[in-house]
Regions:
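A structural signal for short, well-ordered beta-strand segments
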Residues: 1, 189-191
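Small-residue-enriched alpha-helical segments and adjacent helix-cap loops
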Residues: 2-124, 134, 157-164
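A glycine-rich, aromatic-flanked flexible loop/lid motif
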Residues: 26-29, 140-143, 191-193
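Long insertion/accessory domains within large nucleic-acid-processing enzymes
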Residues: 89-94, 181, 188-189
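Short connector loops/turns at beta-strand edges and beta->alpha or beta->beta junctions
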Residues: 101, 149, 192-195
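Short Fe-S-cluster ligation motifs
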Residues: 107-138, 171-179, 195-197
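Iron-sulfur cluster-binding cysteine motifs and their immediate structural context
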Residues: 138-158, 164-186
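Accessory, usually C-terminal, subdomains that scaffold auxiliary metal cofactors
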Residues: 163-166, 192-196
C-alpha cells in the first residue's frame, strides 16, 4: 500500500470489506484499552482483584475496542484502593475504586511509636532530608479532609462514620493504621465534559 493515494485506498477498503469479508474495524478506538493498578498481586491496600476485573471487562468488550459503540473515547480504569495509582477517578469515564465499609484498624502502640519518633512517617519515604520531629497534629489530624480524627496525647480516635477513605492517615502511619476487613469497590460513572467555548 506504500505509494497509494486516498481514492485507491477507498477501492481497496471496499474490496476488503465487501468482497473478501475482512473486518477493518473503526476509524479509531472509542473504547480505550482498560487500565488497572497491580492490585492484590503487589499491594496490601488493594480491596478487590483489579487485574481480574480489568481482564474480564476487556474480554467482555474486546470488540468495542475497534467497532465503536461507546461515546467518544470511553475509558475504564481500576484502582484497588483510594490511593489511585492509575488515577481512575480523575482520568476515566467508568472508575472502579477499592474501598472498605468497616472501621480503620488502629494499633495504638504503633501510633505512640510514631509520635515518639521510633517509626519514620510515610514508611521512611521522605527520609533524605531532616523534616524535624513528627507532629501528628500537623501531619495527620489537621490534614484530614473530613476532620474525623482526634489525638488526646495518648490515644488516636477516628470517627469512621465521617471518614472519606482518602488514605492520607494510613499512608503517613502505615504501621499504626490499616484498611478495614470488609472490602469491596465503589463504581463511579461519568467524566468531566471538555470545555468548549
Amino acid at each position: 500500500l506504500i505509494g497509494t493515494q486516498t481514492p485507491q485506498l477507498e477501492e481497496i477498503f471496499y474490496d476488503l470489506t465487501h468482497k473478501l469479508d475482512v473486518d477493518l474495524g473503526g476509524s479509531g478506538s472509542n473504547l480505550r484499552t482498560p487500565a488497572a493498578c497491580l492490585g492484590q498481586s503487589r499491594c496490601e491496600y488493594a480491596c478487590y482483584n483489579t487485574q481480574d476485573a480489568c481482564y474480564q471487562l476487556t474480554m467482555d468488550y474486546q470488540d468495542e475496542l475497534h467497532r465503536p459503540a461507546f461515546p467518544y473515547k470511553f475509558k475504564f480504569k481500576f484502582d484497588g484502593c483510594p490511593n489511585g495509582c492509575v488515577a481512575a477517578m480523575a482520568r476515566s469515564d467508568f472508575a472502579v475504586v477499592g474501598t472498605w465499609k468497616d472501621d480503620i484498624k488502629i494499633d495504638q502502640e504503633a501510633v505512640k511509636a510514631y509520635v515518639a519518633g521510633e517509626f519514620a512517617p510515610n514508611a521512611g519515604a521522605h527520609a533524605g532530608r531532616d523534616w524535624g520531629k513528627f507532629d501528628i497534629e500537623a501531619e495527620v489530624i489537621n490534614l484530614c479532609p473530613s476532620k474525623c480524627m482526634k489525638w488526646d496525647g495518648s490515644r488516636l480516635f477516628i470517627n469512621n462514620a465521617e471518614c472519606v477513605r482518602c488514605m492520607h492517615c494510613i499512608n503517613t502511619m502505615p504501621r499504626a493504621l490499616h484498611i478495614g476487613d470488609e472490602r469491596g469497590a465503589s463504581i463511579l460513572c461519568g467524566a468531566k465534559a471538555p470545555v468548549v467555548d
